[in-house]
Amino acid sequence: MKRLLVVGMSTVLLVIGLPAHAAIKAGANCPTIGAKKISGDKEFTCKKSGSKLVWNKGVVVKSKAVLFSDFKKSKLKEDLTFSNLGKNYAYVPYLAWAKSGEKIVKFEPTNLKLTILVGPNTDPINKSPNTAVNLVSKMYGDYTQASEFVLVYYNFEDIAWAEKLVDEYIGKNGGYDTSGDVKKLCPSRNNCNSAGALTNSVTGIGLTMVTASDQERKNPIFFSGTLEAHEYSHTIQKKQYFGRMPPGLAPPQWLTEGGAEFIQTASVHYQSFDKYLTDRNKVTEYLYSFKDFTNSRLDAFLNPSKLGTNWDLWKGYDGFRVYDIGFMVSEILVAIKGPNSIMEIFKLMGDGVSFQDSFYKVFGVQWDSAISSITQVLADQLS
């Protein structure tokens, strides 16, 4: 009401106030040749075009990398967008963490049947996995989830036992031949430290296999709940499209794994931003250490041709890149639009919508435009 009153009383006041706040557009009139002004992530220069003075197309301003200690612990005074992402990147972790925590507090866990099965020779590292699973369930309490979630804990001695359970709960309805998955996660007694999520397309049951050799008992991944949270995130992702998505479509692997990596961290540590940052640092430390992810390399990784069609697009990369780079992109998306944004893409693709069109439906911005901003901002941090 107050702003409308000012407009009605004095057009002059409005005109004077615009240059300080309005976004600059290429080709718009500018004051003097050589004048420069930053708008969004670009610096524009005033140039002469014919008889007019106009702003040029602008150049992207390279931002300084944000140090771990420089991340803000407060909300932004303006809405975060892809256009102002560069200058506000220091706020991204807190915004993503806070928006996720708000959903966890708001929702109750879904009416989930949690079944925990432990092999006869197995001593599970995490004795209370239900805590982490319930936090993820609450974060996505407004999404359809599995009718039952089965956690199967086993070690090398219990492989045959675990194989029977996978056959019982999943059988031939896992979307691919899952008969070798149990051994693949635990090929030897001392190489048994992984997990994998499966979903039965007929019953809707989600099953996660969890293994861990004795040397992993002090590894936080196996006792903090983040592993179970990660795998249950996959179960929710799959529930949005499994058995419905048309052939030729597949959510990007970096969104699938990076999204789950973000969800596990934000859910388990929803009460402590400092703990969230600590785990975030562990996930992304390789990227920050090597500093070799340029804009072009990131674009090739995140936006290959045929994006949204299959996972073979990432076979040529180190396997963890879909986790750490995917985490950083998912964090940006959640900071801008909340945790539902990354889950809604799976749901829309289940309806037969391409990844690019799904992205536009969720964010109201074309994917090619958004990824240009994302890769530039991440390159500022990682190159």
Task: Label each region the model flagged.
Residues 1-22:
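Secretory targeting and sorting signals
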Residues 12, 140, 236-240, 263, ...:
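A generic secondary-structure signal for well-formed alpha-helical elements
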Residues 18-29, 84-90:
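Short, basic/low-complexity N-terminal boundary segments at the transition from targeting/disordered tails
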Residues 22-62:
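Tryptophan-rich substrate-binding surfaces of secreted polymer-degrading and adhesive proteins
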Residues 62-217, 221-226, 366-371:
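Non-catalytic architectural context of zinc metalloproteases
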Residues 125-132, 136, 224, 228, ...:
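Stable alpha-helical elements in mature extracytoplasmic
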Residues 187-293:
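Zinc-dependent metallopeptidase catalytic helix centered on the HExxH motif
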Residues 245-324, 336, 346-383:
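Acidic/His/Gly-enriched intrinsically disordered linker/tail segments
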